[in-house]
């Protein structure tokens, strides 16, 4: 999907595998010329609940995957970002007013680098041994995917 297609589509949120609209929208302003480059939906509490429930459903299957399987998915995301870096960089330029060089650095190096790093993170997090209270005990803690985390944060970037 190219930038023109992304910017020209009806405002919607991707929740649980489907595009979901909203009653309210807001413009995305190009800081370079103050033109409206897109319109985005304004999520409400109902959308947040939908997203949370979709994430809970997805997490059950995700939690059953092995660390290497989860890593394969994250590596694929990194590869997809790299493969589409020019289109993504153009979106960053239009939305944030960054130079194309800065935007390419983010989507060509930084973002895929984060995904690639976390793709191998599971191998480093194998667990921990602790000294037991009794001589005939062994205490081992194993990290596993536990559940869904919701974070709603103000995003004021750059």
Model regions and ranges:
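Short, structured beta/alpha segment
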Residues: 1-94
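Short glycine- and Lys/Arg-enriched binding-loop motifs that mark or flank ligand-binding interfaces
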Residues: 13, 93, 123, 143, ...
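Short beta->alpha linker loops
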Residues: 43, 95, 106-110
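Long amphipathic alpha-helix in the N-terminal Rossmann-like dinucleotide-binding domain
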Residues: 53, 75-86, 100-126
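Short linear capping/connector segments at secondary-structure termini
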Residues: 91-99, 130-135
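Conserved small-residue-rich beta-alpha loop and adjacent elements
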Residues: 128-158
């Amino acid at each position: 999907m190219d930038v023109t297609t992304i910017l020209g589509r009806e405002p919607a949120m991707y929740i649980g595998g489907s595009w979901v609209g909203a009653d309210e929208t807001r413009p995305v302003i190009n800081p370079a010329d103050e033109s409206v480059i897109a319109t985005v939906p304004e999520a409400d509490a109902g959308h947040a609940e939908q997203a949370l429930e979709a994430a809970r459903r997805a997490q059950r299957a995700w939690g059953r995957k092995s660390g290497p399987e989860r890593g394969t998915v994250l590596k694929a995301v990194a590869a997809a970002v790299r493969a589409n870096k020019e289109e993504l960089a153009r979106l960053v330029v239009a939305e944030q007013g960054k130079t194309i060089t800065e935007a390419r650095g983010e989507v060509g190096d930084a973002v895929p680098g984060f995904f690639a790093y976390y793709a191998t993170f599971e191998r480093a997090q194998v667990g921990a041994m602790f000294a037991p209270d009794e001589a005939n005990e062994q205490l081992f803690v194993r990290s596993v995917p536990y559940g869904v985390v919701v974070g709603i944060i103000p995003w004021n970037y750059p």
